[in-house]
Amino acid sequence: MIRDLSKMYRRRAHPAPHQPAQPFKFTISESCDRIKEEFQFLQAQYHSLKLECEKLASEKTEMQRHYVMYYEMSYGLNIEMHKQAEIVKRLNAICAQVIPCLSQEQQQLQAQHLLTWTWSACASDTTPLGFSQPFHPSGSSAGLLALSSALGGQSHLPIKDEKKHHDNDHQRDRDSIKSSSVSPSASFRGSEKHRNSTDYSSESKKQKTEEKEIAARYDSDGEKSDDNLVVDVSNEDPSSPRGSPAHSPRENGLDKTRLLKKDAPISPASVASSSSTPSSKSKELSLNEKSTTPVSKSNTPTPRTDAPTPGSNSTPGLRPVPGKPPGVDPLASSLRTPMAVPCPYPTPFGIVPHAGMNGELTSPGAAYAGLHNISPQMSAAAAAAAAAAAYGRSPVVGFDPHHHMRVPAIPPNLTGIPGGKPAYSFHVSADGQMQPVPFPPDALIGPGIPRHARQINTLNHGEVVCAVTISNPTRHVYTGGKGCVKVWDITDPGNKSPVSQLDCLNRDNYIRSCRLLPDGRTLIVGGEASTLSIWDLAAPTPRIKAELTSSAPACYALAISPDSKVCFSCCSDGNIAVWDLHNQTLVRQFQGHTDGASCIDISNDGTKLWTGGLDNTVRSWDLREGRQLQQHDFTSQIFSLGYCPTGEWLAVGMENSNVEVLHVTKPDKYQLHLHESCVLSLKFAHCGKWFVRPGKDNLLNAWRTPYGASIFQSKESSSVLSCDISADDKYIVTGSGDKKATVYEVIY
């Protein structure tokens, strides 16, 4: 533009002699106008280019979206091709067995027909995608595998095992081509007989094994509840009580060895909790009617067909783990992708990886972390993993592969308090700010604070112990298992047999909760049945004096009012039933939970009730007015809760292994992250200064109220499912998955 101006000035200067100042001023003004016009033109051009750039950016985004969509389709087709290839191989093997039984003429005729069909099938399958494969006697399987390899190569998903598998298939097919040049029928018979003697025999054995596993896994809970309740302890440590933590109360940290520990995968057939899924054959609990998968949401549950059912004191039930359909297992190696790492813990009671204090996971399942804040480069791989589950993986029904990712991420700046160990207790303010808790000097010392717990007795119940309770004064322990409650006298450590056995419910139904009235003369029992049994313990021989029948197929937890006049039962349909114990009638139902009500506790003055449910909510109820007071929404199912006797704090145990201690009148709360599994039960000491929390990780932990300093920890040989504390806070009883209850003496 400057050169143009100089030319303009030169052209105007030479034709005529220089005039007075007026023409010169006119030239400058004209030049300024021209500059202004050119600037406006450039500005308009810039604006146009900017709009075009934005349009291209939006088109790029749209193309990326289409790419991901087509990637999913391609990957799904790839998996479908693998499935079809496997079907073809098996059909070929069957034909190879059947054809030799025919006459010679029929053998040749059928072999020719089979070859024709194989060629046409191969051509029709590969042509639409632009792939052409040479003719093979077993060309369908080879062509399909080659197509799968090509598709996989485009998506960068096949791994070394797949390539090796493909190479072996191609080599075998090339060998079959050479033999086919002599006699198609003879080569077909020879190659298929050879395959029959090797591949088909192994495939048939594998298929039979899979069918047996499926039959065993899909058997009804009513018939297989024993198997479903066996806890896999083959890779767990033996029982060894632990003393107080070595770190000082101000450290608020974990041992590094505990953070670095990796839990061995448990068998899908093994289950962690005593509270099995209620018998689908006879009960049809709300477990199967309207359960929810706890996802990151506040209050809208997502229906599913097999959520866990909680047990006594929020002891969760178990989700049956179906086997893989026949024909899918041989494809497993072909379907593995870097993003589709199989989770070794298929049920909500699998040991949940403990979140590091900066949000990372310390288990093999951590590969799923990238799926939650996934980069654009990995979006296609995530879509491929989703497609794998949709098309070929046949994932476990209701399986939530990200259940361990629901642990709230902890910001990197909250990794710990000075001292070098990561924090496990955090204070969450009203505005959501998380800060590690500096424990006070008296966190682990002082009146009413125990030093450790010593195991003094083992009660061999013989069945998985889902519910326990201690009498007041401390003399008898009641353990609830399968179809009965056993009564133990713990004042005589040498007595290894129960003093009585109370048969209730049906023989195959598990007791989920048992509660003693304050006078110790009446026991109320509930579980996987629609009836509650009321036992008269004061009679010469304990007997059932009444039964309360509700419309719900199961009761998960019980609470008794302080005046012993009213019983509250958590029903599998989400309702809270209120029973008049004197008249033995149903007087009211609190309705609010959209899924099974799993746990319950009542205030000391008997005016307020707290309930937790599988709908990810905790609700409080005014017992005088019969209405709901508050609702707290969480991102995980609620398995247990406890109301502090002092009346200020409510502790909530969740499926995602967190414990949250809420203030009942203020928005402040504490989050505790020390455990590595779902919180199956929770109980406050009667002094209110500490509470215990057993779990699937075989640990019994004692915490300081409310900030959660770890007081002591005891290791058991199996999952700890239920617990109770004596009225004098001197004894703790736990029920576990290895068919026993353990009595601890609390040492102060």
From Swiss-Prot:
Homooligomer and heterooligomer with other family members. Binds PAX5, LEF1, TCF7, TCF7L1 and TCF7L2. Interacts with ZNF703; TLE4 may mediate ZNF703 transcriptional repression. Interacts with SIX3 and SIX6. Interacts with PAX2. Keywords: Acetylation, Nucleus, Phosphoprotein, Repeat, Repressor, Transcription, Transcription regulation, Ubl conjugation, WD repeat, Wnt signaling pathway. The modification Phosphoserine is found at residues 183, 187, 191, 197, 220, 225, 240, 244, 248, 267, 296, 298, 394. Residues 180-249 are annotated as: CcN domain. Residues 1-112 are annotated as: Q domain. GO terms for biological process: cellular response to leukemia inhibitory factor; negative regulation of canonical Wnt signaling pathway; negative regulation of DNA-templated transcription; negative regulation of transcription by RNA polymerase II; Wnt signaling pathway. This is Transducin-like enhancer protein 4. SMART domains: WD40. Phosphorylated. PAX5 binding increases phosphorylation. Ubiquitinated by XIAP/BIRC4. WD repeats lie at residues 460-498, 506-545, 550-589, 592-631, 633-672, 674-713, 715-748. It holds the Pfam family TLE_N. The modification Phosphothreonine is found at residues 293, 300, 302, 309, 315. Residues 178-189, 265-280 have a biased composition (Low complexity). GO terms for cellular component: beta-catenin-TCF complex; nucleus; transcription regulator complex. InterPro entries: Groucho/TLE_N, Groucho_enhance, WD40/YVTN_repeat-like_dom_sf, WD40_repeat_CS, WD40_repeat_dom_sf, WD40_rpt. The modification N6-acetyllysine is found at residues 212, 256. WD repeat Groucho/TLE family members are characterized by 5 regions, a glutamine-rich Q domain, a glycine/proline-rich GP domain, a central CcN domain, containing a nuclear localization signal, and a serine/proline-rich SP domain. The most highly conserved are the N-terminal Q domain and the C-terminal WD-repeat domain. Residues 158-177, 190-227, 248-264 have a biased composition (Basic and acidic residues). It is found in: Nucleus. Residues 292-303 have a biased composition (Polar residues). One of its GO terms (molecular function) is DNA-binding transcription factor binding. Transcriptional corepressor that binds to a number of transcription factors. Inhibits the transcriptional activation mediated by PAX5, and by CTNNB1 and TCF family members in Wnt signaling. The effects of full-length TLE family members may be modulated by association with dominant-negative AES. Essential for the transcriptional repressor activity of SIX3 during retina and lens development and for SIX3 transcriptional auto-repression. Involved in transcriptional repression of GNRHR and enhances MSX1-mediated transcriptional repression of CGA/alpha-GSU. PROSITE patterns: WD_REPEATS_1, WD_REPEATS_2, WD_REPEATS_REGION. Residues 113-179 are annotated as: GP domain. Residues 1-20, 157-332 are annotated as: Disordered. Its main location: nucleus.
